Amino acid sequence: MGKFNSAVITPVLAAGSVASPYFFQVNVSQRLCEKSCVESQPSFVPRFSVKSVSAVGTGQYVATIHIEGVIAYTPCNGNVCCTKTQLISQDFTLPFTSATVPTAVTVVAGVSVNVIAGSMCQQCSRNFVSETPLTLTVA
């Protein structure tokens, strides 16, 4: 059985988001086990939860966020009835500032946009990309 790489998770803080609630755009990139049709829409509804909060400096904190979800996609083998799935279950961090010690930190996800990324001439690709807006509220 082959070894699969972890997803690359890249959170970006929205411009102007300097106080709670903080707004992030989270990009999840994952190499799929099998090639998928670039034209087919993969399904991925990630769940996000706050795992922990750590102080890293005066007024500076890092929230460890857990993401979990299943990517469902149609492989490029002509068999539309044969959907494949691949699990993502990982942690990533979101930095934030707070003048007081946080007593509660929550995360809420917006609607994810999912694609199979490929070049113009490619009909199949293993590159799955998902974008999800997140709101991090600190109290």
Question: What spans do the regions from the language model cover?
Answer:
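Viral structural modules
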Residues: M1-A139
